[in-house]
């Protein structure tokens, strides 16, 4: 991968960047127990929500700073800068105080990286987990990663195995015994035009599963299989296969009768129940022009709630978000309508909301119908301070039919000391609103390379907070 000049924002013209990234941010919290949504008082413009654990959110701002915020208060926890990675293992101060909020952040830049970085509360730098050097051949490389339970990290390897790490307060981390390694299930057949991937899943009882996905290019057909470690393996069979696996279920071949006869191409939103082995479809969500969707699982004691948040572009001005409770038989949806030009939203469930919607649509239409000359002048008014709030589109974007008359001179100062390829990996992934607006502005091809992946698990101090276990979130930028 070529390294770009870190002092430059992007090869895209200024007006395209402005169109993509001028949208102010916001965050709405939806509580399914109360069937109400709340808008936080915190200003969330210029930041991206990456992950969350109940009310604590991991965010990234335009200067590539990472920190954790409490969306219900002004509490903020600063994380070390991305360039603060230090080699080697270090001791950790005891952090078992119940009054402290304990967290761990784990990330990597690209699947070809040589390390995974992690940080716990109380540390001022990231420590690295080597995945190439000083690691046995069977545990090298990285394919997928899952942080579960606050102290267990599962890493799927390209050599058909899963590496499990356990975090400790003083030792940092250790590799678990090889007996807990879950090998990939080798593909016994291959069909032309088919692609497959192996991913990790962990159940609520902490049982590790292997999810094998198949996608057929010619028919656009998908199927998957679930495997787990064989609890009662045949001793004779373990001679050639020391880690035998058993198939839990499959979907897309024999078990998919009634789902594979669809003649029209549309998106399916489904939930598969491991206990009943049944697939539950949500037809109301299948015909949406989705730009993004996020599934969440929340718990309250032994009760688990599965929910989904989807987004649909209504037109060039509005985006509609729908929240659906997957456990509810009625599949009742809560709708929120967001302005893509203003940081405003309307509760679609209110009886008197239609009047408010019409008023907002009229107002935004008037602003949207400004002349091209006025729009060009507004774009030319960008200053260095505005540049500081923008995020690089990055990636290998292909832009056509660009209006050069709207370009603005590059007034941005060097915005980071990180190498260009790392910056591109961090910021190449656009939020769903921005990417939809990009497609309306000009044809853009998204890069296939990997972006920054982060996980946040809070494993102490939050279980005593009432009425927060079922809170889901909606975010947009």
Swiss-Prot record:
Coiled-coil segments on the chain, per record: 346-377
F-box domain mapped to chain residues: 412-458
Top-level taxon: Eukaryota
Alphabetical UniProt keywords: Coiled coil
UniProt cross-references to Pfam families, sorted A to Z: Beta-prop_KIB1-4 (PF03478)
Keyword Coiled coil recorded: yes
Name of this protein: Probable F-box protein At5g25300
Organism: Arabidopsis thaliana
Lineage, opening ranks: Eukaryota, Viridiplantae, Streptophyta, Embryophyta, Tracheophyta
């Amino acid at each position: 991968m070529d390294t770009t000049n870190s002092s430059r924002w992007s090869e895209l013209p200024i007006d395209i960047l402005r169109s993509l990234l001028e949208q102010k941010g916001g965050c709405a919290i939806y509580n399914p127990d109360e069937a109400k949504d709340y808008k936080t008082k915190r200003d969330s413009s210029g930041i991206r929500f990456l992950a969350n654990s109940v009310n604590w959110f991991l965010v990234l701002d335009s200067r590539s700073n990472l920190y954790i915020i409490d969306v219900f208060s002004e509490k903020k926890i600063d994380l070390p800068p991305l360039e603060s990675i230090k080699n080697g293992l270090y001791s950790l101060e005891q952090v078992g105080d119940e009054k402290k909020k304990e967290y761990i952040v784990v990330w990597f830049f690209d699947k070809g990286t040589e390390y995974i970085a992690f940080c716990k509360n109380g540390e001022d730098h990231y420590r690295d987990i080597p995945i190439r050097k000083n690691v046995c051949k069977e545990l090298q490389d990285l394919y997928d990663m899952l942080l579960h339970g606050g102290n267990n990290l599962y890493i799927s390897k390209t050599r058909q195995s899963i590496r499990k790490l356990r975090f400790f307060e003083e030792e940092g981390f250790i590799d678990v015994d090889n007996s807990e390694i879950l090998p990939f299930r080798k593909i016994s057949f291959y069909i032309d035009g088919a692609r497959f991937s192996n991913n990790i899943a962990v159940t609520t009882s902490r049982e590790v599963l292997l999810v094998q996905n198949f996608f057929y290019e010619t028919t656009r057909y998908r199927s998957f299989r679930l495997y787990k470690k064989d609890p009662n393996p045949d001793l004779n069979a373990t001679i050639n296969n020391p880690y035998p696996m058993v198939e839990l279920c499959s979907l897309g071949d024999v078990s998919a009768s009634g789902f594979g006869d669809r003649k029209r191409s549309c998106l399916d939103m489904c939930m598969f129940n491991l206990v009943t082995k049944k697939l539950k479809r949500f037809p109301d969500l299948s015909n949406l022009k989705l730009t993004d969707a996020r599934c969440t699982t929340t718990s309250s004691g032994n009760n688990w709630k599965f929910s989904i948040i989807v987004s649909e572009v209504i037109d060039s001005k509005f985006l509609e978000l729908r929240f659906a409770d997957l456990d509810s038989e009625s599949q009742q949806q809560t709708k929120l309508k967001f302005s893509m030009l203003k940081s405003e939203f309307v509760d679609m469930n209110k009886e008197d909301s239609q009047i408010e919607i019409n008023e907002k649509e009229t107002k935004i239409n008037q602003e949207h119908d400004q002349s091209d000359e006025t729009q060009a002048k507004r774009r030319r008014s960008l200053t260095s301070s505005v540049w500081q709030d923008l995020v690089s589109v990055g990636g290998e974007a292909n832009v056509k039919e660009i209006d050069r008359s709207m370009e603005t001179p590059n007034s941005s100062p060097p915005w980071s000391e990180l190498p260009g390829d790392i910056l591109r990996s961090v910021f190449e992934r656009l939020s769903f609103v921005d990417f939809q607006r990009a497609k309306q502005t000009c044809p853009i091809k998204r890069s296939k390379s990997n972006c920054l992946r982060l996980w946040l698990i809070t494993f102490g101090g939050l279980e005593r907070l009432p009425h927060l276990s079922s809170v889901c979130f909606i975010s947009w930028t």
